[in-house]
């Protein structure tokens, strides 16, 4: 599948759980040093060979209920959807890694005065909650993902080049804009919410059905994030096919879709900036003329189009996940603990090559 379609799609998952449409400048500035693991030396791929994009889908629900009065520095909502794209220009491949929102990992905290309050091992999804602005929420999420994968710099600079975040309350709008997405319902988990969402049935999702299918975890027969992640991948695959058809029919369709969803350009999150928290006002600039802005990115729409062209014929690899164990923590919330070296092994195979002679 060509990539203006697939990345947009991929990035449409981002709108399905996000929405992207390509991206990756001709040059990026991320840098990883060589490293030694288990007596073997690994060399990082040159920065010119890789472009990384984090897709963040977040909402403002807690245990199925919207947070009516979040604290001043806890405004971001939790990131229920996280997908990292690693674009390998040398091998012309796109790696995809989807994270379980309940993955336990260090995240940055913010005190009531807005200052950095250190780190704590919590669910990955909570990283997005801390901060007063959307920019801060996204920067904190980037840092947490980098920390989990072991690719962060000592000075908190970015190894992840770009991000696109979406308030996933916009999923119904996205679904409506594309004319509805057809999926095969995998099981009867959602019957209590909508009797038409019966396992084995193939239907076009309309209205609230898209939200039920992609966002619901509580009040289902299988209330785990793993089950929801599986439904999200089903939705993405169908959305990819639909977008491919629409893009082939109209090359400007992606720009139209992005404009309808509304996007804010984050000018503050660059590869040269520190990721510490500040109390500065947000400096995001709306770059679409819509009333609502469901999307934020630290890359412009014009540059989003550049990569789509550059990677048009790249191979898009299957979505990967990290393995681990779910359990009920002492805080009465689900914890997902990765197996030992699970994240490290993915990082080594994706960002590094083993040095000759080892």
What is each stretch, according to the model?
Residues 1-30:
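Gram-positive cell-envelope targeting signals
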Residues 25-358:
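Non-catalytic, solvent-exposed segments at the cell envelope interface
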